[in-house]
Amino acid sequence: MPGTTDKAPGDDTGLLLPVPDEDGAPFWDHAARGELRVQSCSDCDELRFPPRPCCPHCQSFASHWRRMSGRGRIWSYVLPHPPLLPAYAALPGYNAIVVELAEAPRIRLVGNLVAAPDAPLNSVDPARLRIGAPVKAVFTVLPGGVTVPRWILERP
């Protein structure tokens, strides 16, 4: 899956942005269209994430991208104290969550819980974070044109 960088063209925030690699690029292409998709084996139909060339279940190299509902639940979370990078110092109380997808419980994505798609990373009171809380994906276009999935509480 993609690594991260501290700067992208047109970005002056210093926040970490995805750097798509060959296997993960379709994930980000679909995100740019507002779709949450996960790589699926074309032979055994097993989902896999992070994306990779070979199916870990049947070793097939044939794959496609299956659309997900965008719903899930918080499987885990962390509140970094203090913020680990300088650009995040202005965002005290931001979170990083791990979401277990509703239709694929073995697939877990890392992201941020926000109050609205374009809200800052620290827009949700940390006291509202709960393991098992239902969430749904929203998509945010960041400076530099990169679109990332973030998460909002399904029942705020």
Spans of model-derived segments:
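Well-ordered alpha/beta subsegment
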Residues: 9, 106, 110-156
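Residues immediately within or flanking Cys/His clusters that coordinate Zn2+
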Residues: 35-38, 52
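Conserved hydrophobic positions within beta-strands
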Residues: 72-74, 113
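Short, conserved beta-turn/loop elements at beta-strand boundaries and strand-helix junctions
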Residues: 77-83, 104, 140-142
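OB-fold (S1/OB) nucleic-acid-binding surfaces
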Residues: 89-109
